[in-house]
């Protein structure tokens, strides 16, 4: 068995429709069967000590390994990934005879990490947005409500009081996600051109750049969730075409789901 990585899932993915953490382990099919059971037991032990409830688990057995995931609060995803790494160390001890990790020390570290990452205002805003049927996008730096020209963005540590907001002003714009094996960028450009011909102000993200109509905002590979957020927070955009690469889908989940 070989630990590959543990990371946040910041949006809907193949495993969940919400945020969480996933860990990839290279192993045989037989090893995966033993690992899944041990991993869940260790994660449940840590989550119980932390007082985390209503957590969902998911696994995906793949050729050459297994993905191990569980849901986590929006403002504790780095800590959740650290829990996954600790669970791997505990499994490595149980199944492979590696040194045993110290549970008490790890628990103290997790509590400190959760306290440092905590952002109850962000969690509350997410709940209020869901209750009002409003799309919320977030990352380490910013959170936004609505999409495109109907959106507003704030620093993630300077969020508004949800009760002060006029929720009806936050609405979506037509948004298309383009994924697949070949031809994504070409399809995005073609669709954006069609929308521009219909007098739309089009935001597009691709492996080449982010653009608003014919103005290139930044040249880079923007086919992941970050590109989607950049386009959908632009106040001029009234339609969006987003290239959605499989790498971003697998590593972080969707950048937007409305």
Label each region the model flagged:
Residues 143-149, 162-258:
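Phosphate-binding loop of NTP-binding sites
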């Amino acid at each position: 068995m070989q630990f590959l990585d543990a990371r946040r899932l910041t949006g809907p993915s193949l495993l969940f429709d919400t945020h969480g953490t996933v860990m990839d382990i290279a192993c045989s099919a037989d090893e995966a069967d033993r690992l899944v059971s041990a991993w869940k037991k260790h994660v449940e032990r840590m989550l119980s000590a932390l007082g985390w409830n209503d957590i969902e688990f998911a696994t995906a057995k793949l050729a050459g390994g297994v993905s191990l995931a569980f849901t986590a609060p929006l403002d504790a995803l780095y800590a959740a990934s650290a829990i996954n790494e600790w669970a791997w160390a505990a499994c490595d001890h149980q199944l492979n005879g590696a040194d045993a990790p110290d549970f008490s020390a790890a628990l103290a570290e997790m509590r400190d990490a959760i306290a440092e990452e905590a952002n109850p205002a962000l969690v509350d805003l997410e709940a209020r947005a869901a209750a009002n049927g409003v799309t919320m996008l977030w990352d380490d730096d910013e959170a936004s409500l609505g999409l495109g020209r109907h959106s507003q963005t704030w620093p993630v540590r300077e969020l508004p009081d949800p009760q002060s907001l006029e929720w009806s002003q936050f609405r979506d714009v037509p948004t298309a996600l383009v994924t697949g094996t070949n031809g994504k960028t070409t399809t995005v450009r073609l669709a954006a051109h069609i929308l521009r011909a219909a007098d739309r102000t089009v935001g597009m993200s691709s492996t080449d750049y982010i653009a608003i109509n014919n103005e290139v905002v930044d040249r880079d590979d923007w086919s992941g969730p970050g590109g989607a957020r950049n386009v959908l927070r632009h106040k001029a955009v009234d339609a969006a075409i987003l290239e959605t690469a499989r790498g971003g889908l697998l590593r972080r989940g969707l950048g937007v789901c409305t």
